[in-house]
Amino acid sequence: MQLAETVHDHHDVFWGDMSVIGCGQAHHIRHAFFAGMLSVAALVLAPPGAPTAAAEGCPDVEVVFARGTFEPPGVGGIGQAFVDQLKTQPQLAGKAVDVYAVNYPASLNFPAAADGVIDASNRVRDMAARCPDTKMVLGGYSQGAAVAGYVTADKIPDGYIPPNGINGPMPPEIAKHVAAVALFGKPSNGFLNSIDRTAPPITVGGLYAAKTIDQCIPDDPICSPTGSDNGAHQAYADDGMTAQAAAFAAQKVTSAAVVDTASR
């Protein structure tokens, strides 16, 4: 859940020692993880915090989504595709679906992703307190998937010092308010270690594991140890994975609502 505070100078604060994967491969992976975001960003349709019809009250569903690196503020291209497809799911017909864009830099400075962990965690806690009947869908793409994954963590990994603003994992009782978690192109632990050896592994917590869909295109070098196609990292909307995740999330939202009704 937490990102270590220990960093080096401005230039290696994100990348660390790239020699472990070779200069040529490092260049191509950087291009996949970051430069590719520029074309994905062109798909963005909604600014952060854009109000919906249910903005003054409590929506039936709220999507809390963290965009990928270099994408402008909002939910990003992959996030918008996921939201659009979620809203078309038949199980959610007639339901008010709001969107909250996680507020964080989404920059080359990976330790600053802690800002996103704090913001997303605070949003989930706030919604759970103010709107206990709202079903939340937590998600993220690329660096944003790391943010969302850290939010679900059960504990602070041994040896990691949490940055200011993070005191520990979310309380267990919050988990029942999060119906689904959707991750796209989540950085693998091997990728994290190759670019920032201070970053803790991304482990989805036990309370969230069964309601998490972790989408990784096999050729995506960011999430797949055997991936080698840089373009695959930005193909989640085109290859059907956002649609698949939307169907999964809608089913989980519906199931959570049924459980809540039965328990009353």
Language model region names:
Residues 1, 193-194, 224-228:
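Short conserved micro-motifs at the rims of enzyme active sites and ligand-binding pockets
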Residues 84-91, 195-211, 215-217:
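Active-site-adjacent alpha-helix of alpha/beta-hydrolase-fold enzymes
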Residues 57-135, 215-242, 246, 251-260:
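Active-site catalytic motif of lipid deacylating hydrolases and related acyltransferases
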Residues 117-207:
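Serine-dependent carboxylesterase/thioesterase catalytic core
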Residues 1-55:
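Secretory targeting and sorting signals
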Residues 39-46, 150, 243-246:
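Hydrophobic alpha-helical membrane segments, chiefly transmembrane helices and signal peptide h-regions
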